[in-house]
């Protein structure tokens, strides 16, 4: 995981290429669907409704993989809370309670990386905002006592090597 634009998607593609089970980011799917219906930034327009849909989809991702040795997620369930915190949005306690039920064996986090950061139709945040989101993500995992392993700003191959060393 990590803030926006840190190389998560490329890392997931690299792990998948090596034969690992991977669950891709689903925010783009929700955002693109909303854009087809005339809503440019669904998360900004209705963060709670967006988060409810996202929670359901991420919980489904998590629940379907329980019989695999390793599955890598582009993003975790807990990050829904991090994004709501980033926007200072009040949310139902149910969101937080649902995230407490999810435990990952490892959380690998990618740091903000200005040199590779770029905006697109689903990534609206500035680089500075992406740093704050990264901090919120770190905070939510720490709050829930979930250990995070920091990955370096380096090639996908070196990041994968660090991950494989950590899980073996």
Label for each model-derived stretch:
Residues 3, 15:
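P-loop (Walker A) phosphate-binding loop of NTP-binding proteins
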Residues 51-102:
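Glycine-rich phosphate-binding loop used to anchor ATP phosphates in small-molecule kinases
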Residues 162-167:
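C-terminal alpha-helix
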């Amino acid at each position: 995981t990590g803030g926006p634009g840190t190389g998560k998607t490329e890392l997931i593609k690299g792990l998948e290429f090596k034969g690992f089970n991977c669950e891709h980011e689903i925010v783009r799917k929700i955002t693109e669907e909303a854009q087809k219906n005339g809503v440019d930034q669904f998360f900004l327009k209705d963060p709670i409704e967006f988060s409810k849909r996202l929670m359901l989809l991420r919980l489904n991702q998590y629940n379907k993989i329980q019989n695999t040795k390793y599955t890598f997620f582009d993003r975790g369930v807990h990050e829904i809370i991090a994004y709501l915190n980033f926007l200072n949005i009040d949310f139902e306690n149910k969101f937080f309670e649902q995230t407490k039920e999810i435990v990952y064996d490892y959380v690998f986090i990618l740091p903000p990386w200005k040199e590779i950061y770029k905006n697109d139709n689903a990534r609206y945040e500035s680089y500075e905002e992406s740093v704050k989101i990264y901090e919120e993500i770190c905070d939510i995992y720490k709050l829930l006592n979930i250990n995070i392993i920091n990955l370096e700003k380096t090639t996908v191959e070196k990041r994968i090597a660090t991950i494989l060393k950590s899980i073996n």
